[in-house]
Amino acid sequence: MNDLIKHKLELLPSNPGCYLHKDKFGNIIYVGKAKNLKNRVRSYFRGSHDTKTELLVSEIADFEFIVTESNIEALLLEINLIQENMPKFNIRLKDGKSYPFIKITKELYPRLLITRQVKKDGGLYFGPYPDAGAANEIKKLLDRIFPFKKCKNPANKVCFYYHIGQCKAHTICHTTEAYWQGLVEDVKNFLNGHDDKIVNQLKAKMKDMSDQMEFERAAEYRDLIEAVSTLRTKQRVIRQDMQDRDIFGYYVDKGWMCVQVFFVRQGKLIQRDVNMFPYYNDAEEDFLTYMGQFYLDSRHLKPKEIFIPGDIDQESVEALVGDEVKVFKPQRGEKKQLVNLATKNARVSLTQKFDLLEKDIAKTQGAIENLGKLMGIPTPVRIESFDNSNIMGTSPVSAMVVFENGKPNKKEYRKYKIKTVEGPDDYASMREVIRRRYSRVKRDGLTPPDLIIIDGGQGQVNVAKDVLRNELNLSIPVAGLQKNDKHQTNELLFGDPLRVIDLPRQSEEFFLLHRIQDEVHRFAITFHRQVRSKNSFSSKLDGVEGLGPKRKQKLLKNFKSMTAIQQASVEDIQALGIPEKVAQALLDKLSQDSH
């Protein structure tokens, strides 16, 4: 379990919701649901598990969660997220079982079935449902309301369900194809949330039975109406109107804004987008700016509807998204609850960010202090680190990065072209760079670092110490970071004489040094590539009479590459103020060089 997970586990809420485990590449590998997110997610990292779960846990590098209002919503959200992301461990841990669907068969006399396999057989499938219990509950209700075929009897032989009015799949009923098509449409509407027609029919039948003094039959219809009402509540996913909509919520704190967008498609929450950023103006105005940018992104297709929080100006949003999208600012009811849910998740995400940030700051500060203690020096608040880069002595450069309070200060980074060294001499290059940097620090009265770290071994460190002490009369601690044969941070060298400082590989101090070494190496090698590319460019332009340094610079600035120059015309080059004769000579030379 890494430190990120440790910190996130401490911040989990006790609400119901869904959690998404991710691997080191950011891929969602498992989606789960929980009545209590805190207890459920923590359980993965405590105690022993079976082999399958141990394999899952071994791949978890991070996790996210979505808070829901109820366990039922968590159940149904889990299904949608699994369908959308297809996490590999959901398939493994459920032993190949898929979620249940309700099916209407394509037969002369259609049947209602529960199945876990969706086939291209002309049947109609509804679902998926969270479990077999939920699917069975719905099917039982459908069986009581709709007289589909329920038996295996031949059509000319009536069954028990015929006698209680729940099956009309018999020749004696004289049903037509149009009748069954109408029945199928009624079921489709019912399962898609449009149940008003059925409820009204049941109410009418209840009244008829009551008027005929058939009170037991009237009570049966009353119970059916109550069952439909209960089912409507329990099976709410997001909305049962199958509409596509985006639901926005946002939260601000400490100069930061978090915006959460729930993507609802076909009535199901399939995905969310989370963005956190500093805001500088009025919160509502910055939210509107974000919305405008959101739909300029080609990945975000505009839905039919958008729900926004109550404090956002509706007309402004309508102007941003255009007439083809309906914008709603819900004031009450289920739609308002959905906006509240998005806002609640925005608050949870932003609060978690601050909590993690505070822990990270405290952790980094502790690492800096401990590093100073281990080295026997004052806390190294400012660290300057150096690395050289060259290929067989060509285009030699050096680079310096600065870390303050454990974080990179990129404004303070510096690049150096080696001026006095010929050939591949790493020690001489380090001597030149240390001399140039700290002569300027001394001359201009700049604040010296608390620690200098050289990306190198004993030789480079001793060279740096010699320049500081014997040439510049400066007393600044110098340490070296040696790499192993795999080019990985291996050990810290420090002291007089130099010795290896014992740092546990899993310590925060080691991680800090590793980040510094990676950063200075990245910065140096990037600079070296830039210089080498420029030098290569210039060398191909050598030997053309009338093409001096300034004109070469113009060509480099405007054409960017040799290929672009080769493809240019004489007129293109003349446009830069280069004479026609020189332009033609250049193109002739490049043409010869390419053959």
Curated annotation (Swiss-Prot):
Its main location: cytoplasm. GO terms for molecular function: DNA binding; excinuclease ABC activity. Residues 14-91 form the GIY-YIG domain. GO terms for biological process: nucleotide-excision repair; SOS response. The keyword DNA damage applies. GO terms for cellular component: cytoplasm; excinuclease repair complex. Residues 196-231 form the UVR domain. Keywords: Cytoplasm, DNA damage, DNA excision, DNA repair, Excision nuclease, SOS response. It is found in: Cytoplasm. Disulfide bonds: none annotated. The keyword DNA damage applies. InterPro entries: GIY-YIG_endonuc, GIY-YIG_endonuc_sf, GIY-YIG_UvrC_Cho, RuvA_2-like, UVR_dom, UVR_dom_sf, UvrABC_protein_C, UvrC. The UvrABC repair system catalyzes the recognition and processing of DNA lesions. UvrC both incises the 5' and 3' sides of the lesion. The N-terminal half is responsible for the 3' incision and the C-terminal half is responsible for the 5' incision. Interacts with UvrB in an incision complex. Belongs to the UvrC family. PANTHER family: UVRABC SYSTEM PROTEIN C, UVRC/OXIDOREDUCTASE. This is UvrABC system protein C.
